[in-house]
C-alpha cells in the first residue's frame, strides 16, 4: 500500500476502506500509510462516530482564548500603523504606551500578527543593512559629544529643480537636530542651516562628515570654508574613510528611515511641500519613533541641548606655549627655518601653530585641527589624514 500523492481526504477514506476489509491490522495499516498508530486509531474512532464527515480536517484554533486581544485594542494598533506606515509592531506598541500608559497591550509578536492579518505588513526587497560601526563611537556615547552631518541624496521638485535635504543628528540620542532642503550642496546654503542648529541646540564637541563638498576638500587638513569655521568655533572635525559609509552607520540608517517614510511625498512636490514633509518626519522620528538602542525610548526623551552656547563673534584661535606661531601669507605660504612652505590659501592671513614632534617632522595645526607635518628634508607639508574616532586629531 504505497503512500500515493492524493488529497488528504481521499487518503483517509482509502485507509478506512482497507481497515474495513479486515485484511490488515492497525499496525500494518499505520506502517503502510506512514502514520503513527495513534493517528490510525483517531481516524478509525472519528469514522465510527461521525462517518466520512469525521475524517475532514478540523481547525486547531482553541474554542476559547482567555488572552484574546480586545477589538478596541486591535483597532488602535491598526490605526496607529496606518498613521505611521513606516513603524513596525514594536514602534507601534511603544507609541501607544506613550499615548495611553494605562492601556493593556499585547506582545510584540501578537501585534505583528494583528498587522499582518490587517494586510499592513509589506514585504521589503532585501537590502544589505548598514552594520554597526566597525570602529567604536568613543565620541558618540554622550549627548553632543559627536554630531553627524550629510545630505540625503536628491529629490526633484515640481518646478524641475533639485532638493538636497541637509541633515544633522546627535549620535548618542539619534535626535535629528536639523533637516532642511537646500538647492545646492555648497557653503552658502550649508552655513545658515548650521547656524540655526547651533543657535537652537548649542555647539557639539565634534562633527562627523564624509569627504564630500562642502565638508571636506583636498587642501591641508581637508579643510573647507565650512569645516574651517567649525574649527574656529572649537569643534573637532572628524571624517569617515572614503567610500566607507558604515563609519557613519547611525546617520545612514536615519536616512533610510527618511526615504521609506516620505520618499514618495518628496518626489515631484513643491519646495514648500517638501520642507513640510521633512519637518513632519523630524517630529515623528524624534518624538514618536522609539529606538531599541535607546531601550525603546524616543530620541526626544533622551536628548538634551549642549551647554556650549553659540556666538557668531569668533575669538582668535589660541595656541599652546610649546607651539611656534606663524602667519600664513596671502599666497598660502609660511616661513619656517628659512624655507617658504605652502600650507593653504584658505588660511591666508590666519595663524597656524607649529611644533617639532620627531626627527625631521614638524606638526602644523590650525587651532586643534591637524593640517599635516612639515618634512624638513623636503621643506614640504605632508598632509594629514583625519578619520573618524581614533584617527589623527
Name what the model sees in each region:
Residues 109, 113-175, 183, 187-205, ...:
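Mobile-element integrase/transposase regions
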Residues 219, 225-311, 353, 357-358:
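Charged alpha-helix within mobile-element recombinases
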Residues 1-14, 63-71:
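Short, Lys/Arg-enriched anionic-surface-contact patches
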Residues 282, 286-393:
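C-terminal, beta-rich DNA-binding module of retroviral/retroelements integrases
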Residues 52-146, 154, 224, 298-310:
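Basic, flexible linker segments flanking DNA-binding modules
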Residues 7-24, 74-83:
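Short, amphipathic alpha-helical "recognition" segments used to contact nucleic acids or chromatin
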Residues 15, 29, 40, 51, ...:
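Mobile genetic element proteins and their domesticated derivatives, centered on retroelements
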Amino acid at each position: 500500500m504505497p503512500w500515493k500523492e492524493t488529497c488528504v481526504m481521499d487518503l483517509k477514506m482509502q485507509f478506512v476502506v482497507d481497515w474495513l476489509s479486515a485484511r490488515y491490522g492497525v499496525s500494518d495499516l499505520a506502517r503502510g500509510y506512514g502514520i503513527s498508530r495513534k493517528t490510525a486509531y483517531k481516524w478509525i474512532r472519528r469514522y465510527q462516530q461521525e462517518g466520512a464527515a469525521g475524517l475532514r480536517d478540523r481547525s486547531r484554533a482553541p474554542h476559547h482564548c482567555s488572552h484574546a486581544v480586545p477589538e478596541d485594542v486591535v483597532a488602535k494598533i491598526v490605526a496607529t500603523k496606518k498613521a505611521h506606515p513606516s513603524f513596525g509592531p514594536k514602534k507601534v506598541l511603544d507609541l501607544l504606551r506613550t499615548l495611553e500608559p494605562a492601556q493593556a497591550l499585547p506582545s510584540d509578536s501578537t501585534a505583528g500578527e494583528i498587522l499582518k492579518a490587517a494586510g499592513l505588513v509589506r514585504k521589503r526587497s532585501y537590502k544589505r543593512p548598514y552594520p554597526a560601526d566597525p570602529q567604536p563611537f568613543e565620541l558618540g556615547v554622550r549627548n553632543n559629544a559627536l554630531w553627524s552631518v550629510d545630505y540625503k541624496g536628491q529629490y526633484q521638485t515640481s518646478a524641475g529643480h533639485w532638493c538636497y535635504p541637509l541633515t544633522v543628528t546627535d549620535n548618542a540620542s539619534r535626535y535629528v537636530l536639523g533637516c532642511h532642503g537646500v538647492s545646492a550642496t555648497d557653503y552658502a546654503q550649508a552655513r545658515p542651516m548650521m547656524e540655526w542648529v547651533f543657535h537652537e541646540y548649542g555647539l557639539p564637541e565634534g562633527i562627523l562628515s564624509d569627504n564630500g563638498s562642502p565638508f571636506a576638500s583636498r587642501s591641508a587638513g581637508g579643510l573647507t570654508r565650512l569645516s574651517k569655521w567649525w574649527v574656529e568655533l572649537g569643534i573637532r572635525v572628524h571624517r569617515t574613510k572614503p567610500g566607507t559609509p558604515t563609519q557613519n552607520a547611525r546617520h545612514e540608517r536615519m536616512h533610510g528611515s527618511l526615504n521609506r517614510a516620505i520618499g514618495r511625498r518628496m518626489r515631484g512636490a513643491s519646495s514648500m511641500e517638501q520642507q513640510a514633509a521633512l519637518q513632519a518626519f523630524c517630529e515623528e522620528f524624534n518624538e514618536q519613533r522609539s529606538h531599541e538602542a535607546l531601550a525603546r525610548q524616543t530620541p526626544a526623551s533622551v536628548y538634551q541641548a549642549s551647554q556650549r552656547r553659540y556666538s557668531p563673534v569668533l575669538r582668535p584661535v589660541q595656541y599652546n606655549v610649546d607651539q611656534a606661531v606663524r602667519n600664513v601669507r596671502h599666497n598660502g605660504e609660511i616661513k619656517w627655518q628659512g624655507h617658504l612652505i605652502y600650507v593653504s590659501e584658505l588660511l591666508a592671513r590666519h595663524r597656524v601653530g607649529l611644533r617639532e614632534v620627531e626627527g625631521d617632522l614638524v606638526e602644523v595645526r590650525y587651532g586643534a585641527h591637524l593640517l599635516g607635518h612639515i618634512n624638513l628634508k623636503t621643506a614640504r607639508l605632508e598632509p594629514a589624514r583625519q578619520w573618524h574616532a581614533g584617527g589623527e586629531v
